[in-house]
């Protein structure tokens, strides 16, 4: 570790507020020194750490010293109940040694101070701490001595209390601070054990782009707490937990609760457990289906829907982003690249004019000897005429017309002012000017036009200032973190080669291209970004907590747009920690490449921008976080007992405007530097305050977390299991009488109409079944379109005729003979001299022979011209049941066995919701 002095968090359980450990540089031995933190490291609330002050949160019993009484260290004189391990052999990180520390900042401390770094369990215990020979060693630190049964009894009591209070937790990953703070609250850990031969499912990073906004497997794609990619830590806090459990009590209690249900689960990735199998009172630190904003592809897609959720423009805080694997996005990106190049030409003209006016004649004469001959020849080799500026002006003018919706009548597939071939030539000349140093010729008249159009574009293009004039874009994998696979490019053909050369790599939108911020805010000529934490405790209503403390990460190289190497433009600590600082780097920059937000605020005051943090930066970051969550609220699986801590990365423009780059799930909590050692431990402690302490006490201290957004609750109707069921049967096609045969078993009485005849498919006769359906349909259509005058029926009670689009109302039935078929068993027999009907109605457009006492009620609104349905007749039941969903038939009477009319039995009212219509079901009659 470098620097004059560096702060080191010793242990979350051994330090109080405002304490840190320092090491004086240049010392050959380990010389860590404890002193108070500087004022800029403190916050405005009372205690930096949530150490329990009440007896309920403290450890219920005091753990006994495992060794003999003669080797027991004395209690510290500070007045608290913490044990003094000063008699233990000191070591620095992995080596155990003892040394005297000089005073702070060069002063001499007469009293020797030993480091409190405990030995690991792999190291042998000192002779003074070895158990007696007559004792049985159960495991490291726990011996079956005189007080063995008492420790077991106390551990059992503590476990029973934790089980009763539902204070069982389970952790997957390296979270020593969480373990320590939960143990202080009386929680007992249940070890997460995986069966031999099984492993956690690897995160699936290559999925369909359509699923990236909803998938369960991609929400944690930007997690940085992966065991395989763990950052180097300034201090391994797991050693302190092992030393704190030197007597084995916590290991014993973990074994006691191995069959208990954990009520707090803290994991690195969400896919470790399936939330669907958790009970309602089990808390977990992840939400399912959060990939809609924790992946670059999901954030790119969902922020486009922001106008539907809020009156805001995503282009004002999120750089333009496209998916290279999607054809629509690819086409939009190409057009955006063209227009950006045209705007950059206008900027170059204005910049060259300002430069020519600012340079004096004397300065030009002084620079003339420095201009070597090759440079003059290079300028003469390539010269771009003023026509190139006219093309750029015309393209920008057409773009303004398109934004104003003046191109409504234009073909959407037509090119933007220039054809694709012309745009290709335009880009080649643009590359010559920007990248190869060609000379751009322009006219004085063109300068004023460029300024006017740029002023108009300023009002409609929010990213005009930050995009610069070199047209640099950054290509990123859709679901990766820590800067893996990121490339900065400035040529369109090179970016499109990623799609053409490797289609499998770009399939389904796995890669995105985003506009690079060419004019970022710099500190001492170096680029930086900011990591901001926020906590989501509910999605309905959406509840967001914003952390007041943050940290910034510097690059190791000076900023330059001519060098597109990742060491210059990517500030991820996972990349920069492997690089050496440039010799041209400003000496005021920190050696560990990190500042706290308090130090950044002090720098803003030094550069005469004291209000930039409170008036521009913080409000902009809060708004960006809220908008990103609003657009993803419908995609995330809401679970009341879940919560999640996210880390957002921001880059600032020259006007201090924050630009959201990405949002990471499971942000790293590794104490890689002195800044992260303090802040990462603090954000974990304050997270437990919000999700655990606040559930019991709504007015408790939430640390540095601030509630910035909470929606009104939206009630979701509960599913009660109601099934919508529609019952019924199809209406049989009527059977014309002219084609019936004697002895044919039929389920309907044979009818005769004025239009032709045809046998029903249900008549049972193979001969008549072969009748053409096409002819029957043609007859029906002919009957519908051209009804005969004699077949027109008047509307009951009115003098008007029924409209022709009701074909059944224009059909008039004729009796073939004074005979009718009567059912006897399964054979139809003829009955003579009985008149059974005069009119009939059918929904199929053909007449049916019906009884004179039948009525048909329409359950749907009729045609406007037909205000009342006429009286209609229905045949009696002839050995079948007819159930109709379109027409309701109410039968009031029937024919007796001898042909006389009889009264029908009263029909009971049906229960609502069980019939075929909204009022009552179809009735069944008996003949």
Curated annotation (Swiss-Prot):
Its cofactor is Mg(2+). One of its GO terms (biological process) is flagellated sperm motility. It is an enzyme of class 6 (ligase). Residues 345-702 form the TTL domain. Disulfide bonds: none annotated. Two conserved structural elements specific among monoglycylases, IS1 and IS2, are involved in glycyl chains initiation. Two conserved structural interfaces likely constitute the binding platforms for tubulin tail and microtubule. This is Tubulin monoglycylase TTLL3. The lineage of its organism: Eukaryota, Metazoa, Chordata, Craniata, Vertebrata.
